[in-house]
């Protein structure tokens, strides 16, 4: 039988949450990202989206996500158009559904970085074009593609590795790591104070995927138990965008700082251990935030020490670069009319 070369399991699909994809699909996007990174490094054109127009919607400020989507679009031959919080009125002056219909008639794809997951879902439902979640309060799928691409780049595999997230176990990055790792067969440890454990709903969702993949999941407030056997130690800011309860959060999370003592708890050989952070990081006092934190709480480092952040284990800048390559893979796969048959 002749294959239909128009077949593409991703074409026209939105990327709203990791749970919507199989392990095989996620691994394809990760591997495609690695391939596109090689093309980029060797100055080989890959303009799969020539002539396409991409809307970049940002309710929340961004450095890496905006830069990654912009450069990825241009490399793929598309034109990105940035619409910031002063340009879009989701649910304020115009309903999200109406905005979706207007943008969908003008653009070929939409990136959305905002607060409500429901807004991303409405945009995908009513725009008629692929919508890519650049971050919501619940999920961060584009970060996950970059993260697990970075892990595979360093270890040559994913399945069977152990990734430990230490910090606020309720935030979107922790949610996404727990679920994505469970889908991919990566053991995930969440090390956090009990008050900041992932919700039961998120844990149950991850457990369902882990039963199929064989991933081992652990949620604990015990540092020694949680760090043991880790290949990847990951952290994020202690207080997320828009939150104001700094003092309570800092006091809760002080024992959960990623420092050299914590890395030693892994018992993992140096060449089998890396540190990751989705950035920005409060690892010194070279920012206004850092100065404010020092004045209010008497600390010069928060979620990670400068020693770890600048150590041989650190991969956060490689991880940040991979945002571009993995986003490029996602955009090309869902909008580029490529031949990607079902496995």
From Swiss-Prot:
PROSITE patterns (alphabetical): CARBAMOYLTRANSFERASE
Q: Name one GO biological process term.
A: arginine biosynthetic process via ornithine
Q: Which domain of life is it from?
A: Bacteria
EC no. given is: 2.1.3.3
A GO molecular-function annotation: ornithine carbamoyltransferase activity
Q: Which Pfam families match?
A: OTCace (PF00185), OTCace_N (PF02729)
- Per UniProt, carbamoyl phosphate binds at 62-65, 89, 113, 140-143, 278-279, 323
| Keyword line | Arginine metabolism, Cytoplasm, Transferase
Q: What is its main location?
A: cytoplasm
Q: Give me the residues that bind L-ornithine, please.
A: 172, 236, 240-241
| One term under GO cellular component | cytoplasm
Matching Gene3D superfamilies, A to Z?
Aspartate/ornithine carbamoyltransferase
Where does this protein reside within or beyond the cell?
Cytoplasm
Q: What is its EC class?
A: transferase
Which pathway, metabolic or otherwise, does it act in? Amino-acid degradation; L-arginine degradation via ADI pathway; carbamoyl phosphate from L-arginine: step 2/2
Task: Provide the catalytic activity annotation.
Answer: carbamoyl phosphate + L-ornithine = L-citrulline + phosphate + H(+)
Q: Which family does it belong to?
A: Belongs to the aspartate/ornithine carbamoyltransferase superfamily. OTCase family.
Function description? Reversibly catalyzes the transfer of the carbamoyl group from carbamoyl phosphate (CP) to the N(epsilon) atom of ornithine (ORN) to produce L-citrulline.
Q: What is this protein called?
A: Ornithine carbamoyltransferase
Q: Which organism is it from?
A: Levilactobacillus brevis (strain ATCC 367 / BCRC 12310 / CIP 105137 / JCM 1170 / LMG 11437 / NCIMB 947 / NCTC 947) (Lactobacillus brevis)
As recorded in Swiss-Prot or TrEMBL, the protein's gene is named: arcB
